[in-house]
Amino acid sequence: MTRTVHDPNTDGLDDDLIGRLGPRIEPRPVGGRATGFDPAQRVAMAEAVLRAMSMTGPFARLVMLTGHGSTTVNNPHASGLDCGACGGHTGEANARVAAAILNDPDVRVALRQRGIDIPDDTVFLGCLHDTTTDVIRLFDIEQLPASHADDLRRLRALLAKATSLTRLERAALLGIARGAATEQQVVTRSRDWAQVRPEWGLAGNASFIAAPRARTRGIDLGGRSFLHDYDWQQDKDFGTLQLIMTAPMVVASWINLQYYGSTVNNAAFGAGNKVLHNVVGTLGVLEGNAGDLKVGLPWQSVHDGSRFVHEPLRLTVLIEAPLEAINGVIAKNDIVRELVDHHWLHLYAISPQGRVSHAYRGHLLWQQLEERSEP
């Protein structure tokens, strides 16, 4: 919990070797337990993953499946900067396993029989976005065929440009003055033992949008939205809608409420001052030398020393799907119904024309919103 290097398990190993040390999907016993996935499981998972992302074609030659994680040291709250949906771990394993399954030729044959035709020259890459340094790691690239060498070079050039631009944007939020060493200062924060604010995590989160990506493409959402590319017209029986509303939407609400509570009343719902923390076993932290284990986020995760960085707002959820389908998910799932009927989040529906058309008012009732004319 107070590691002085980011990942002690791989510290000192060659980067190329680390990139090849990945999860295996073949069924085998490990420690007396079965691991891996049999052929039927792989096909079912591949179809579920692609349909959940509305990624059923056409496919590019290289498709990045990118998880996220953070790089910090001497930080007992490091898991709070990793993936909430991964239980406080990075998304590396998920991305690499998904890529391996989707690159399996037998899986692709079975997917074609289910209406998803992945071209033979499409290769999926498991990747990891380091949200502290904005480096994008590409895994298992030694398995890329020689025919994709130019594609890989172009991808790396584009990623390098995107990384540079994002670091400059992040620097402003971190109070780093723009200059020749701006990007290096962003990276240095990830290795600084004394840094209490290596990155802002999900501070500022305010909305969750499940709709075709075309609805938000080109709009600057300020890094405050959880986005899901979802097309309800491709969603048979609205199974994907149920998955989105019962899993990522719920997790996003939990994250939002954690930031909300840690901002409005850090003494009760947050973890207090990170500088005063003492780690207790592997369980949590105390503020000072006594008291109860702290919950929530430390003060430094929501405040920069002079102002709040997080604006405490209940999550606004916008979903493009028929009202009947959304109501069906609410009616069948207590965890969703409790969130929306008790007003822990705001729920809105987007019409097929792309307009926010209805607001949820509780107990499966909706209020139609007036359409405003453009000036």
Give the location of each predicted region.
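Beta-sheet entry/capping signal
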Residues: F59-M64, N205-S207
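Short His-Asn-centered micro-motif
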Residues: L65-G67, A210-A211
